[in-house]
Every structure is written in structure tokens, then in C-alpha cells.
Amino acid sequence: MASSDKAFTLDIVTPQKLFFSGEINSVIAPGLNGLFQVLKGHAPLLAALKSGKVRLSLSDRSEDTFQIAGGFFEVSGNKAILLTEEVS
């Protein structure tokens, strides 16, 4: 599918593997002070994450959700990286 003009790249990485790498329209993640959402063009960000649910809105308009065991989230340019110990 063609890249959406609303999409940006997200990598989800655990110590064992690259769990996800692809284009998404948004991500909602569990920050230490509550949920936050990131869209394309977000200001640079580095945030600590607590255990909880992550929701992806994929560029093909589908959604995906999964649990993480805390970690860190970084946004720079139109790329985001979520580092976590475990994803289920």
C-alpha cells in the first residue's frame, strides 16, 4: 500500500528482537504520568513508559494493540522508537 501523508515510522525493539517496524498514523502509549499520543510531525520527545497497553493506528487504517513491560519512547523527526523489555 502507498505511504500515507499522515504516516511516520515506528520501531518497537526488545532485547531479543525487532518486534515491529513500519509506518503508522498514530501511537498511544502509557507514559509514567498517563497516556500520550504521537502523530506525524510531533516535537522531539523522550519519555519513560510504564507497563500497559500500546495502541497503533496503522497506515492501512487498521489498528493493533499489545501490552508492554515499561520502557522508553523517543521521537525524532518522523521516526519513533519504543524500547521495552517485553511485548505480548
UniProtKB/Swiss-Prot annotation:
Question: Whom does it interact with, and what assembly results?
Answer: F-type ATPases have 2 components, CF(1) - the catalytic core - and CF(0) - the membrane proton channel. CF(1) has five subunits: alpha(3), beta(3), gamma(1), delta(1), epsilon(1). CF(0) has three main subunits: a, b and c.
Matching entries from InterPro entries are given as: ATP_synth_F1_dsu/esu, ATP_synth_F1_dsu/esu_N, ATPsynth_dsu/esu_N
Report which gene this protein is encoded by. atpC
Q: What is this protein called?
A: ATP synthase epsilon chain
Which protein family is it in?
Answer: Belongs to the ATPase epsilon chain family.
Molecular function GO terms recorded: proton-transporting ATP synthase activity, rotational mechanism
Q: What is its main location?
A: membrane
Q: Which UniProt keywords apply?
A: ATP synthesis, Cell inner membrane, Cell membrane, CF(1), Hydrogen ion transport, Ion transport, Membrane, Transport
Q: How does it sit in the membrane?
A: Peripheral membrane protein
Q: In which organism is this protein found?
A: Chlorobaculum tepidum (strain ATCC 49652 / DSM 12025 / NBRC 103806 / TLS) (Chlorobium tepidum)
What CDD domains does the database record attribute to this sequence? F1-ATPase_delta
Which compartments does it reside in? Answer: Cell inner membrane
A Gene Ontology cellular-component term: proton-transporting ATP synthase complex
- What function does the entry list? Produces ATP from ADP in the presence of a proton gradient across the membrane.
